[in-house]
Structures are given as C-alpha cells and as structure tokens.
A protein has these predicted regions:
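N-terminal phosphate/diphosphate-binding loop that engages ATP/GTP or pyrophosphate donors
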Residues: 34-101
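Extreme N-terminal, non-catalytic leader segments
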Residues: 1-14
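Hydrophobic anchor at the beta1->P-loop junction of P-loop NTPases
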Residues: 17
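Conserved lysine of the Walker
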Residues: 25
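Small-molecule kinase domains that catalyze NTP-dependent phosphoryl transfer to phosphate-bearing small molecules
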Residues: 80, 125-131, 141-144, 148, ...
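Hydrophobic positions on the alpha1 helix immediately C-terminal to the Walker A/P-loop
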Residues: 28
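Walker A (P-loop) phosphate-binding loop of P-loop NTPases
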Residues: 22
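ATP-dependent NMP and nucleoside kinases share a basic, alpha-helical "lid"
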Residues: 96-175
C-alpha cells in the first residue's frame, strides 16, 4: 500500500510536545520531525547536558547559587546529523552518550527545577523556534517556552506502562535496571516535575491530551500526525 502524504502546509510553525518522563515524547517527536521535514529539539537533552556538567564538577544539583555560578562557563551547543539525530555539545565536546547514563536523570530533574537554569536556556530554545519550524518536547514547552505554538500536545501514559518502556530502552542501551527501581524513580520524578516552583509540569489549557498507554509506537505516531495535520490546515 502506498504511504499517504502528510499534507502539512509549507509555512513556519511550531509543535510543542509536553508530558511526564517516559511518555515517549522524544521517540515520537523525532519520528514526526522526520516525517514532516522539520527540526526536532529535545529540550530534555539540553537539561541533561547541564546536569552532566554539574555532576562532573561535583556540585549539589539543588544548590542554585553554586549551579548559577558555573552557567557562564558553559557553552551549550547542538549538532544535527544527516538523519536528524541531535547531538549535544558541552564546551565543544560531544556528550550525547554521557548525558544518557541513568545517574544523569536525577541531576537533570534537579537542575531543571532551578529558575536560574530555566532562564539561562529559555532564549536559546525560543531562538531555535524563531529560526526553524520545530517540534520541541519537554515539560513546559506549551506553557512557558512556546506559549504561542500553533500545535500543543500533552503526551502521557500510565506510570506502569512508562516504566516498562523505560526498562526496555535501558536494556537496549546495555544499562538494564530492575522494573521496581525504574517505577520508583519515575514516580519520584513525576512528583518533582509537577510540584516544582519554576514551570511545573502541566498541560497547557489549549493542549490536546493524548494517552498512549494502550497504543504502540506506530499507532501513537499516526494519531499525533493526524492531530497536527488537523490543527495546521
């Protein structure tokens, strides 16, 4: 069967995808970006890069004064491969692999709750959306970073399903963890993300909420593409 064309108008636009950890935001957003021919921006990777820098310097990630002090010394960059893969650079060094280590997750969550860090990265993220049509995923894209995005999606799934998916992902990366531990960490991060003072995780009032608990990857991707197509036409 011939694949249907996406039929998205040729105009500048932004798609904001928010949701809790492990909801599949990055995997789906990357696939949709490739389908639509637009830039994919994984803001979680940007915060992971800050978290990695903080850990490497031995700084307590919740110590805002200490974290703020090193921000001017950090040059955060991105490089895109031909296949659209986003690589993160820290002071010129490719840290894409390092920031995905399991222990960086809690550092990323902690530093992302700091107003100083969010302010430091906000203009960088907005500048990308001004220069390119983007699909950007994170925790506060539709509410804070791109409040005027043409399409806003809040992607979610049950904690149990997200934990199962994360376990599979970690196993594929060669860094397996027990399901109970992954579930506990997800629940902890959900609480931290939704209760932080700076830009807590929540769906924008005009966001379309999509629960993928009962959907596989292909069904989730097609559902999101249909929503985006409907909003932009």
């Amino acid at each position: 069967m011939r694949e249907m064309q996406t039929m998205i108008p040729e105009k500048h636009y932004a798609v904001a995808v928010d949701g809790p950890s492990g909801a599949g935001k990055s995997t789906l957003a990357k696939a949709i970006a490739a389908k639509l021919g637009i830039l994919y921006v994984d803001t979680g990777a940007i915060y992971r890069t800050i978290g990695y820098a903080v850990k490497r310097r031995g700084i307590e990630p919740r110590d805002e004064a200490a974290v703020r002090a090193i921000l001017p010394e950090l040059e955060i960059g991105m490089r895109y491969e031909a296949d659209g893969e986003q690589h993160m650079l820290l002071n010129g060094q490719d840290v894409t692999r390092e920031i995905r280590l399991p222990e960086i997750s809690m550092y990323a969550s902690a530093v992302s709750a700091l107003p100083a860090v969010r302010a430091f990265l906000l203009e960088m993220q907005r500048d990308l959306a001004r220069k390119h049509s983007v699909i950007m995923d994170g925790r506060d894209i539709g509410t804070v970073v791109l409040p005027d995005a043409e399409v806003k999606i809040f992607l979610t799934a049950s904690a149990e399903v997200r934990a199962q998916r994360r376990c599979l992902e970690l196993e594929q990366r060669g860094t397996p963890k027990p399901y109970d531990e992954v579930l506990r960490e997800l629940n902890e991060r959900d609480y931290n993300d939704s209760h932080r003072a700076a830009a807590p995780l929540r769906a924008a009032e005009d966001a379309m909420v999509v629960d993928t608990s009962a959907l596989d990857f292909d069904a989730s991707r097609e559902a999101l593409l249909a929503l985006i197509r409907e909003k932009l036409q």
